[in-house]
Each structure stands twice: as structure tokens, then as C-alpha cells.
Amino acid sequence: LLPEHQIIGVSRNNNTQDRNTSWHQWDWLSGRSLELPNEEISTVIVILKPISFDENGYQTGYLKAAEIIIKNLNQSFDYQKLVVMSSTRVYGEKNGRGITETAAPQPDDFRGHIILEYEKIMRDQSKVEPLILRPSGLYDPKQKWMQKFMNSFEAKQHSLSSKESNRFDRNILAKIISNYVAQKKLAELSGIFICSEPPKIFSELFAEQYPDKNFEDFFIASNHLGKSFDFQKLIASNLMG
């Protein structure tokens, strides 16, 4: 993606060198300042994750990291656009079905609350109005759904909490970001965009990928219809091309 652009990757531990990407290792929790070869950056893309899956890990990985990163960006760099990677986890069961960007998030757990607070930090402290992407469960179309579970199956069925899966192709998400960076006509876009596909029943997903196996042998189905999303704003934006 973006062969005509110079990409600077910043990670706490990744120093892989790609064709048009230079990686810089920076542990933002170390107290050191961010140093990069360029002071002017067209687009900043922030993708954070928890350092552990408990509440403290989420607070450190999202809230503390966000404060440090945006402070360093504002102090030392000029940037024109900011992409903030969030999640549909900010919405809860109380948000119901057909959730749009106008719905006030009602998170179910501390994870959703912390991610929502992370969004607010980035929005309030950024020099520019950010583009906030809220994808549902990201998947790689080249990998079979729940392959890891199937490979380690030991005759104990897995109970599903809902009937359907909310998903989004990670390749399409990459295309959205690429289009936003490269296409001038999209530069004025900002605000929240839900990135999700139509919900799909788990048993149908399983049948597509394991047609010779019986879904009920591996999973205990649920009739509960959880939250679902309306992604018409994303379609209308032309971010997907």
C-alpha cells in the first residue's frame, strides 16, 4: 500500500524494515521523547493495544499511552491529519441493533469505557479533528474462522454468547486508511466511522469454512441476537473506494 509515500512506523518493539517503511523503536512508557527524521508529517495513524487484558493493562495501553503520544506529537511535529483506531466495543447490548454513529455509546465493560475515554483524549488534545475508525471484530479472509480453536479442540463444546458475528475484513480497513492518506478529496473527512459488515450467523460461517464438519459437535449455539451496526455512513464516505 501507498508505494509513493514514505511511511515511518513507530513501535515499542518492532524494527522491521519494509520497502517504503522505516521503523523506529520508541517505548513511549520509558519517559524518552519521540525523535523522528521528519518534523512535518501529512498523516498520523495511531493504533494502540492493551499491555495486558486486565483493567490496568487497558488503562496503561490506551489512556497513559495516548496522553504521552499526543503530547509528543504536538510538541515536536506538524501533522495535517490524524487517524485514531478505536473499536465497536465502545457500544454495548443496550445500544441494540442497527447502531449508527449518532448513537451515544453505552459500553458493557471497562474495556469499552477505556477505549471511549482514549478516543476523547485524542479528540480533545489533537491539533486537528481526527478520523476515528470503529471496526468490529477484525479478521483475515485467508485464515479460517476460529482455526486455533478447531486445532486445539478436546471434545469440549464452546458456548457462544450470541447467534451472530460482527466482523470486518482487515484488508478493507487497510484500504480505508490508504485511501484517506492518498486521496485529497477525502482529506476533509473527520469524526466517527463504524467499520462493520452485515452480521453473519456463526453456524453459517462455520459451514462455509468446514463444510465436512457438524457445527453442533464443536459449539453450543445461542439464540441471542446481540448488537449490530449500520455502516451506511462509511459506504457514503467513499473511504472504501
Model region roles, listed by residue range:
Residues I68-D108:
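Conserved Rossmann-fold NAD(P)-dependent oxidoreductase catalytic core, especially the SDR/UDP-sugar
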Residues G9-N14, W28:
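N-terminal Rossmann-fold cofactor-binding loop
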Residues L1-E4:
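N-terminal Rossmann NAD(P)H-binding glycine-rich loop of SDR-like oxidoreductase domains
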Residues N95-I132:
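Catalytic helix-loop patch of NAD(P)-dependent Rossmann-fold dehydrogenases
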